[in-house]
């Protein structure tokens, strides 16, 4: 068995195994643990009562967190004409069509979100092997293929998070950064879970939100007592 580091030992001493934590208690405890050498994110994992092997039970969507994620988001938009002007006015970092595609093919992929208007998909379609592996391919299911690119840019800049159930039926996403006030972090998590419940697959049976776990980038995961959340 690998020997625990000094930091891991200090963390283990503060964690109570098997406990379901009140949300505020969990957030405060995670923030008090020995810090990494960078500002860590708060991450959430939500175990859903779905069978991800069934296409009609794959949960995929996006949520605009009321207090954002604390991250600076770089956005590229594939569109043209008045929509291009609207995207720039909304805060897009780069707007283009074939010229932008050429830049991305050349390796310029310093973006967190890529958005496209429907008429631009003929260009974006050529970038599947470039954008797909990085999770950047625009998709109408998460609002990144839309005629209203300006709103999509505003949402991305405001802290919209995108998620999809993994092979175990769990969604993972960041919900803030260390330094967030516990009440704002809680409201972000509640907004996410409310959206997950809103898009519950009709074929999902039994308990839908089975477990909620809060962690930091380099820290442990703490199971949250769901009765401490207003959802």
From Swiss-Prot:
Gene3D superfamilies given in the database record: 3.30.190.20, 3.40.50.790
Keyword Signal: no
GO biological process terms on file: regulation of translation; translation
Record-level GO cellular component terms: cytosolic large ribosomal subunit
Gene Ontology molecular function terms on file: rRNA binding; structural constituent of ribosome; tRNA binding
Pfam families: Ribosomal_L1
Keyword tags: Repressor, Ribonucleoprotein, Ribosomal protein, RNA-binding, rRNA-binding, Translation regulation, tRNA-binding
InterPro entries (alphabetical): Ribosom_uL1_bac-type, Ribosomal_uL1, Ribosomal_uL1-like, Ribosomal_uL1/biogenesis, Ribosomal_uL1_3-a/b-sand, Ribosomal_uL1_CS
Superkingdom classification of source: Bacteria
Keyword Ribosomal protein among record annotations: yes
Alphabetical list of HAMAP family matching this protein: Ribosomal_uL1_B
Complex formation: Part of the 50S ribosomal subunit.
Record function comment: Binds directly to 23S rRNA. The L1 stalk is quite mobile in the ribosome, and is involved in E site tRNA release.
Family recorded in the similarity comment: Belongs to the universal ribosomal protein uL1 family.
This protein's name: Large ribosomal subunit protein uL1
Organism: Pseudomonas putida (strain ATCC 47054 / DSM 6125 / CFBP 8728 / NCIMB 11950 / KT2440)
Species classification: Bacteria, Pseudomonadati, Pseudomonadota, Gammaproteobacteria, Pseudomonadales
Recorded name of the encoding gene: rplA
